Amino acid sequence: MNNKRVFHFPKLENDLIPRVFNRQPVERVPVWLMRQAGRCDPEYRRLREEDGRSLEDVFRDVDFSIRISLLPRRFGVDAIIMFQDILTPLEPMGAGFQFKPGPVLEHPITSLDSVHQLKIPEPARDLKSVGRILNGLKTELEGSLPLLGFAGAPVTLALFMIAGKSPNPKVSEILDFMDDHPGFTKSLLDKLTSVTIDYLNYQIESGANVVQLFESFAESMSKPFYEKWALPCHERIFRNLNRDVPSILFAKEFSDLELMASSGAAALSVGNVVDLSEAIQQFPELIFQGNVDNRIIAEGDLDKISDATLNCLKQSGGKNHILNLSHGLLENTSLESVLHFINTSHSF
């Protein structure tokens, strides 16, 4: 990646993340959290309980999604990420999931015929609620904070589609199935990659300042599988996104940084299996996001949270770094712990 590449952002009151991406000095490391709008927030739980609808209905409700997305603003985060599900683009493909309460697909995608029947959506027509959410967030934020969009990576989406539900605990079996059926797998991943490119570019057109690709089961992939199936999708996606907008690759707990770095993403969101100081030294052209262990935020006392946060910041030395977790906030995380994590980072 070209060290001199410049990303274009609108004028923002809080421009820490834009400055990190453009290699400009920052007074502190910016921070946001995956799943920052969610169950660890009592206000989120109250709103969901009062509303009473299923998640699929909530995700379609533009005003409600905007309201939920903005809740973490009061935490002191340096970015807002759209409240939405990674499975959202699958419905207009003909593979819509219902939440019962977990995601369920009535007819799993397990044959080449079922792949051929999947449609390629037109985002401005078929996913316009996502565009309206991002437009609404941009209006509400009034240039105060950067806005993040996101999508599930093709292999992650394929795992859900083949399983017809959350692929846990059978991820390894499904990955073996994909490897054993290369014609089926290539056809499905090619189609999902095209959909993801269109979906993320639509999010950028609708107001996203940064986009993140979630490869949520990367820790279960062998390096040969990742290189054969996941990486070509990542490369094609990042190659075809708007080059003015930075992209982040999150490959959950995957440790081969060379493979991740070859994706073409501007930033890598890494887990606590990665030594941040070594990563930044090895890949000075990249931004790194992470990598405080989310289990410490969920289960550790405040002193442990402080230690983990400060250790992470010391590893990066405040250079080429956006502070985040190893992956998403766990359900049993207290709001007190989240706020302590953020406030500790502000004091560094």
For each of these PLM feature ranges, what is it?
Residues 51-54, 112-122, 175-185:
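Short glycine/proline- and acidic residue-enriched helix-loop micro-motifs
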Residues 61, 111-114, 169-170, 300-301:
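Intrinsic-disorder/low-complexity, polar/charged segments
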Residues 126-348:
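Active-site loop segments of alpha/beta catalytic cores
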Residues 20-36, 77-104, 125-169:
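Glycine-rich, aromatic-flanked loop segments that form ligand/cofactor-binding clefts
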Residues 1-95, 99, 236, 336-348:
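N-terminal basic, low-complexity leaders that serve as flexible interaction/assembly modules and, when applicable
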Residues 9-10, 61, 116, 132, ...:
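Iron-associated oxidoreductase/ferritin-like identity signal
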Residues 22, 32-35, 41, 45-48, ...:
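Generic, ordered loop/turn and secondary-structure boundary motif
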Residues 81-101, 105-123, 207-226, 326-328:
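Glycine-rich, proline-tolerant flexible connector loops at the mouths of alpha/beta enzymes
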